[in-house]
Amino acid sequence: MAAEATPGAAFGPRRRLALVIGINDYENYSKLTNPKNDAEKLSSLLQNIGFIVDTSSLVKTYAEVMRKVLDFQLSIEPNDVVLFYFAGHGIQWEGQNYLMPKDFPKFPEINEADLKEIDGISEKDIVKKKIADILIKDISKKKISDILKMKAVNAQDILNTLSDRKPYVTIFLLDCCREYILRNPDLNRRGVNSNTSNFKSTGLAAMHKAGALIAFACAPGTFVDDRPKDKNSLFMKHLLEHITTPNEDIVNILRDVTNGVMKDSNDEQIPFLSVQLRHNNIYLCGQGRGKKNDFE
């Protein structure tokens, strides 16, 4: 539920708004341990430093996430400071990053109507079978694209819609670089090579937007593991440690987070920052030492 704004809750004259989403209990993909804890802890700390935070625990399905994003977008006024955080499953497909809601469906099976183009091809004919495999894979790729567009949330679209409201800055944090494979059991039953019938996630793609600060938990094209023995992800562990640091620019905070993650992972996990800020000296907690705080 959204936190109520109170007099003096926001530091300085600019409002601070945050939408924080963490999804653990996926219906059709591996359940995760950290996202819900990460979202709850981050929300609490953001509220403590003056953010108006929306972190409803009911936001899980595609319809709920899309409605919440729309409501959040419409709440943004020019010159607000905006923070968006998502933890859960995410996937890159054809250069776009998609955030997966709780009810993201299984890989769709190919039915007989989809295979009508290859009727009559003999499985004994090696050349024709290769043609059949190619056609099946093309059909599968189209189905993946269609279902992602209809049932997953395009991260770049969220970033664009938030930025279109003309906020002072958009801070966009994604902790969803987990590896998995979109499997098509129907193709495997037909004997199609698993390297062609299953589509492996390749991590997230870099994102850009003027006026935004974008941070991924790991570098584009790489992955992180869920940490079932720990309450928080490695990225969140260090974000929680640094985000309330007074008198520190947000870019420096995220660099400290990056250094901490790299140290703890022996450089196996490298967070990625994309900085296209229009303003300098953005402090989330306190004013810069002897500097003009552009946040105010």
Residue ranges and their predicted role:
Residues M1-E296:
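Cysteine endopeptidase catalytic domains of the caspase/legumain-like
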